[in-house]
């Protein structure tokens, strides 16, 4: 059993380098999604069934002949299948975890075959509320089934089946993605060799559920929401979605980070420095939040926001075991890496420590890193050398165990 590693300068797993010398760090290149169609009905936790659906995916690297080098990356609330590389449709669209995944990066695509999946209900190509309901010929809208993290895992498992992957070398994710990785380890233990959970939690606190509820109410009470059927009305509940994003964005940053970025800096103050005594933008932080909200409302779907935040609320694997997290995690056979960040108040380090304690109680191999970083919850997306050293070291250990001592020849992957 691996002992927990707290605030490491370098992780113990990085001590012995893999024999092969990887190529220089680089981009995963120009990438485009593939759309997989699944006609087998998918039973959902709600009791409903989704009769056929599509999932948008992207892949990076090459699947080896033994199909043992696959890594599934699960995305957070507003992300997608576009994990790394540059979108073929937009050269400015770089993958949301491009600093983590690619040639020579912590998750080295010279060795690993990485899959990014856009979850059901999302708005980046997979079947969701904006998709056409075959029963009506109109967008699903509010009629789209409510989903859970476990529903996403069942759908993702079919992607693994599509590629003939019996067992992932690792399933990983940050935030909501970490919940999916944890769910994989519990619900499909035989299919996960390693589970990497970053800046996540085994359940939402009352405060977090409260934030989600306020965000949802902002959307639902927008006059342009039309009960979720705004597509038919040619409207977008942009005001509500913008406010929802502003609320969420505050929770992703630490107080210190916001103080350093904005402080009480004024936005175009009067010549004499006086306040304007009105309700338009007065401070830089207000301008920033408005910009983030308005930008988000132009590309994200409001019904998707409702679905995903409710899936967050419902995630609680210990609910089935009377609140005993160790019992809930007992089916897991994977090795675990957990990473938390000191200033993350959305999913604070104590939630990761709680998972570590439960796993150790079960005798599961666990490596834990608690990174002292000022950036709050969003630190999991940033290029922090200490954080990346932990992840790199862990994946190098996996590579040694799997005998991935050299780059996998790019012979093409199954479509």
Swiss-Prot record:
GO MF annotation list: homoserine O-acetyltransferase activity; homoserine O-succinyltransferase activity
Enzyme Commission numbers on file: 2.3.1.46
SUPFAM superfamilies given in the database record: alpha/beta-Hydrolases (SSF53474)
Subunit structure: Homodimer.
Protein name: Homoserine O-succinyltransferase
Species the sequence originates in: Bordetella parapertussis (strain 12822 / ATCC BAA-587 / NCTC 13253)
Residue numbers marked as site, Important for acyl-CoA specificity: 346
Regions that span the bilayer: none
Positions contributing to substrate binding: 245, 378
Reactions that this protein is recorded to catalyse: L-homoserine + succinyl-CoA = O-succinyl-L-homoserine + CoA
Family membership: Belongs to the AB hydrolase superfamily. MetX family.
NCBIfam families the UniProt entry points to: homoserO_Ac_trn (TIGR01392), PRK00175.1 (NF001209)
Residues annotated as domain AB hydrolase-1: 69-383
A GO BP annotation: methionine biosynthetic process
Purpose of the protein: Transfers a succinyl group from succinyl-CoA to L-homoserine, forming succinyl-L-homoserine.
């Amino acid at each position: 059993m691996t002992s927990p590693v707290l605030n490491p300068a370098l992780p113990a797993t990085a001590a012995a380098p893999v024999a092969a010398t990887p190529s220089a760090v680089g981009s995963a290149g120009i990438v485009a999604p593939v759309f997989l169609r699944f006609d087998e009905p998918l039973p959902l936790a709600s009791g409903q069934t989704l009769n056929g659906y599509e999932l948008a995916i992207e892949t990076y690297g090459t699947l080896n002949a033994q199909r043992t080098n696959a890594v599934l990356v699960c995305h957070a609330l507003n992300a997608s299948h576009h994990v790394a590389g540059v979108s073929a449709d937009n050269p400015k669209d770089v993958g949301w975890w491009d600093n983590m995944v690619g040639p020579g990066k912590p998750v080295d695509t010279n060795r690993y075959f990485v899959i990014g999946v856009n979850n059901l209900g999302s708005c980046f190509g997979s079947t969701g509320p904006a998709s056409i309901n075959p029963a009506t010929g109109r967008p699903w809208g509010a009629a789209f089934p409510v989903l859970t993290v476990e529903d996403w895992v069942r759908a993702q498992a079919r992607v693994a089946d599509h590629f003939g992957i019996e067992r992932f070398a690792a399933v990983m994710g940050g935030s909501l993605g970490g919940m999916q990785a944890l769910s994989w380890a519990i619900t499909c233990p035989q299919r996960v060799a390693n589970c990497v959970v970053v800046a996540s939690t085994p359940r939402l606190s009352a405060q977090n559920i409260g934030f989600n509820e306020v965000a949802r109410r902002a959307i639902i009470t927008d006059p342009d929401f039309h009960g979720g059927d705004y597509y038919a009305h040619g409207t977008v509940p942009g005001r509500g979605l913008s406010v929802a994003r502003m609320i969420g964005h505050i929770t992703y940053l630490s107080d210190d980070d916001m103080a350093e970025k904005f402080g009480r800096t004024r936005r175009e103050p009067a010549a004499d420095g006086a306040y304007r005594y009105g309700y338009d933008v007065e401070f830089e932080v207000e301008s920033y939040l408005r910009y983030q909200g308005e930008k988000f409302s132009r590309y994200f779907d409001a019904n998707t926001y409702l679905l995903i935040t409710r899936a967050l609320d419902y995630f609680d694997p210990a609910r089935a075991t009377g609140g005993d997290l160790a019992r809930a995690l007992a089916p897991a056979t994977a090795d675990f890496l957990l990473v938390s960040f000191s200033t993350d108040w959305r999913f604070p380090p104590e939630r990761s420590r709680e998972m570590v304690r439960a796993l150790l109680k079960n005798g599961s191999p666990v490596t834990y890193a608690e990174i002292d970083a000022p950036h709050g919850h969003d630190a999991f997306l940033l290029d922090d050398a200490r954080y990346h050293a932990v992840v790199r070291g862990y994946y190098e250990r996996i590579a040694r165990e799997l005998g991935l001592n050299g780059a996998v020849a790019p012979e093409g992957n199954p479509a």
